[in-house]
Design a protein with these regions (language model features):
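Metallo-beta-lactamase
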Residues: 1-171, 206-274, 295-301, 351-371, ...
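Phosphate- and divalent-cation-binding pockets in alpha/beta enzyme and binding domains
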Residues: 187, 211-215, 283
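Active-site metal-binding motif and surrounding structural segment of the metallo-beta-lactamase
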Residues: 156-204, 292-298
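Active-site-proximal loop/helix segment associated with metal-binding centers of metalloenzymes
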Residues: 147, 242-267, 384-407
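Active-site-proximal loop/helix segments of hydrolase catalytic cores
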Residues: 191, 246-325, 346-347
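Binuclear metal-ion centers of metallo-dependent hydrolases, dominated by the metallo-beta-lactamase
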Residues: 202, 217-235, 290, 305-308, ...
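Active-site neighborhood of phospho(di)ester-bond hydrolases with catalytic His/Asp-centered motifs
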Residues: 142-143, 174-183, 204-207, 272-278, ...
Length: 460
């Protein structure tokens, strides 16, 4: 095909894709009152870092040429995949299978189920998507809390919940620490943050993200901004922001001043890892060597696509990352709650179970809202199959899902634990949080105190 003809053909393709996109947007507009057409919750865009917070961002070794950089070269979108082609895929491909065919069997969590301390000292409750309540030795940590109906700056459009929240936020009870992995709408929810800010929680966030929280009314002294490999001690826990392979984007204008991260949370008896959103990179083994082994890992297994293969794990990659981290029990998350990728709704669970069985990994796949203790994980019963929109005659990836395998998978040697440092016995004010900043080959080498900008002040 000659070059002019090729360009004409491609222009025709793009025009067709644009037509499909505009058709679907037009249908959405037709169902709305006219006064809703331009209604945008502009506060949800957040705010850019300023002052001391911006100074900390600019001084990060991971901030290069005006924006944060990933641990390895990364493309948010794969080459050859135009935004219009992406939108066409998300809107048109296999649409009937991207949502459940019936109501998701959510476990209606009652406050009484959380009133008794866990026997082992560690309990996890997956509340949907990346939201997990972790109870570690009497301290309650809430990861990436999202209670809103849509993950969008709009009230009328954007990814909508596929199942209700298992527990109203008002019934959750006190939260000690809120941990945010990055500023995407499905991980950082303005309305949920504002509600949680009415309590006494301290908010741990990656560098720059605290600007959003402060814009929404969270007092600066309650915000702890951390760079990769920095740690803070809160309420007897040590929280460390660890690298991830992703990106941030929230407002109408691009900004590279917000960091993304995974998280390590340690008590005197237990260790947890939360992946946030991330693509595959070699750093999982490094994190496992420094901080593992982990009692449980919470791993992103959904919202993957050939369009963005470098910024979201596939289920198979998530299982391998769990092994590299030295995890004992893996909790798959970031699937089943919002329709964010072209894959079928149930596919992340099926592929995760298949990969875990092949690798001999202990898996816990509870219904949303069902608490469990990693010391005694529940059998991996495939509850999702009852509501999946699986075509007649289609084969499932895992015909049977047996009980979990033993905690130490065959052929897996757990990483050596990192030397423990003293943990605070009582919850300090965020302005007095001690931070630990490890070097590449050392567990830790310096400490500072948290300033009013929400981040550690390094000693002169």
């Amino acid at each position: 095909m000659s070059r002019p003809v090729s360009w004409l053909f491609r222009a025709g393709e793009l025009a067709a894709e644009a037509g499909l996109l505009l058709r679907d947007v037009k249908r959405s507009y037709r169902t709305l009152p006219r006064e809703s057409w331009h209604r945008v919750r502009t506060d949800a865009f957040g705010a850019d870092p300023r002052g001391k917070r911006l100074h900390r961002v600019s001084g990060s070794p991971h901030f290069v040429d005006g924006s944060f950089r990933n641990p390895v070269p990364t493309r948010p979108l794969a080459y050859g995949h135009t935004p219009l082609a992406l939108m066409r895929t998300k809107l048109a491909v296999d649409g009937g299978r991207r949502s459940p065919a019936a109501a998701v069997p959510v476990h209606r969590l009652l406050p009484a189920e959380l009133s008794t301390p866990p026997e082992s000292g560690l309990r996890l409750t997956w509340l949907g998507h990346a939201t997990v309540l972790a109870e570690l030795d009497g301290v309650r940590v809430l990861f990436d809390p999202v209670w809103s109906e849509r993950v969008s700056p709009f009230d009328w459009i954007g990814p909508k919940r596929l199942h209700p929240v298992p527990l109203p936020l008002a019934e959750l009870g006190p939260v000690d620490v809120v941990v945010i992995s990055h500023d995407h709408y499905d991980h950082l929810d303005m309305d949920t943050i504002r509600t949680l800010a009415a309590g006494d929680a301290v908010f741990a966030v990656p560098l720059g993200v605290g600007a959003h929280l402060e814009h929404w009314g969270v007092e600066p002294y309650r915000i702890v901004d951390l760079d990769w490999w920095e740690s803070a001690e809160l309420d007897g826990l040590r929280l460390t922001a660890t690298p991830a392979r992703h990106y941030c984007s929230r407002g109408p204008r691009p900004s590279g001043k917000f960091l993304w991260s995974s998280w390590v949370v340690e008590s005197k008896r237990h260790r947890l890892f939360h992946s946030g959103d991330t693509g595959w990179f070699p750093g999982f083994a490094d994190i496992g060597h420094r901080f593992g082994p982990f009692d449980a890992t919470m791993m992103q297994v959904g919202a993957y696509s050939e369009h963005w293969p470098e910024v979201h794990l596939t289920p198979e990659e998530a299982v391998q990352a769990h092994r590299d981290l030295g995890g004992k029990v893996m909790l798959p998350m970031h699937w089943g709650t919002f329709n964010l990728a072209p894959h079928p709704w149930e596919e992340p669970a099926e592929r995760t179970v298949a990969a875990a069985q092949a690798a001999g990994v202990t898996l816990a796949v509870p219904r949303p809202g069902k608490p469990f203790e990693p010391a005694d994980p529940p059998p991996a019963a495939p509850w999702w199959r009852a509501v999946a929109a699986t075509p007649a005659g289609a084969d499932v990836l895992v015909p049977e899902a047996p009980s979990p395998v033993p905690d130490t998978p065959a052929g897996l040697t757990a990483a050596a634990p990192r030397p423990d440092a003293p943990l605070a016995a009582a919850k300090p004010a965020a302005s007095a949080v001690r931070t630990v900043e490890p070097e590449a080959a050392a567990a830790e080498h310096s400490s500072g105190r948290s300033g009013q900008d929400g981040g550690p002040v390094r000693p002169a």
